[in-house]
């Protein structure tokens, strides 16, 4: 069996191919049809804009950003202490927001909102509600 497989493969001597034998290929590999396994829960599915998955993700992210801006950020800024002041310069993260909601806060709250949304979507898919 190994000798027939070696005769059907091309042989090389340096960069030049040597003569290929014309022996017929006998049962080296059988082609099996591809079968789909599972229901594709881990695959990415592009739904329309008003799909339930999209609405859950948008709602959870929006609620987390709203909670961060109006609930979490003002209380965090009130409890902050002065800390060590070595040099009085602008950090580059400050915005004109009166509550002090910065870019870092936006990214953090958006990330937490996405994590909550993914958990809700996967949980609902697991019980079959979506």
UniProtKB/Swiss-Prot annotation:
GO CC terms for this protein? chloroplast; chloroplast thylakoid; chloroplast thylakoid membrane; nucleus; photosystem I; thylakoid
Q: Where are the transmembrane segments?
A: 48-68, 103-123
Gene of this entry: PSAK
- Gene3D superfamilies found in the cross-reference section: Chlorophyll a-b binding protein like (1.10.286.40)
Q: Which InterPro entries match?
A: PSI_centre_PsaK_sf, PSI_PsaG/PsaK, PSI_PsaG/PsaK_dom, PSI_PsaG/PsaK_pln, PSI_PsaK_pln
- Compartment list: Plastid, Chloroplast thylakoid membrane
The UniProt entry lists membrane topology as: Multi-pass membrane protein
**Assigned protein family:** Belongs to the PsaG/PsaK family.
Q: Name one GO biological process term.
A: photosynthesis
* Record flagged with keyword Chloroplast: yes
Q: A Pfam family for this UniProt protein?
A: PSI_PSAK
User: Mainly localized where?
Assistant: plastid
| UniProtKB keywords | Chloroplast, Membrane, Photosynthesis, Photosystem I, Plastid, Thylakoid, Transit peptide, Transmembrane, Transmembrane helix
The entry's protein name is Photosystem I reaction center subunit psaK, chloroplastic
Which residues constitute the organelle targeting sequence? 1-46
């Amino acid at each position: 069996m190994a000798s027939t497989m070696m005769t059907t493969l091309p042989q090389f001597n340096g960069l030049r191919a040597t003569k290929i034998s014309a022996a017929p290929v006998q049962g080296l590999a059988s082609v099996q049809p591809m079968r789909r396994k599972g229901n594709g829960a881990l695959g990415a599915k592009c739904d329309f804009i008003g799909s339930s998955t999209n609405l859950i993700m948008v709602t959870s992210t929006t609620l987390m950003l709203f909670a961060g801006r109006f609930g979490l950020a003002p209380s965090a800024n009130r409890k902050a202490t002065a800390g060590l002041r070595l040099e009085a310069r602008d950090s580059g993260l400050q915005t004109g927001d009166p509550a002090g909601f910065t870019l870092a806060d936006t990214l953090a709250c958006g990330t937490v909102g996405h994590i909550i949304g993914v958990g809700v979507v996967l949980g609902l898919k697991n019980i079959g509600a979506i």
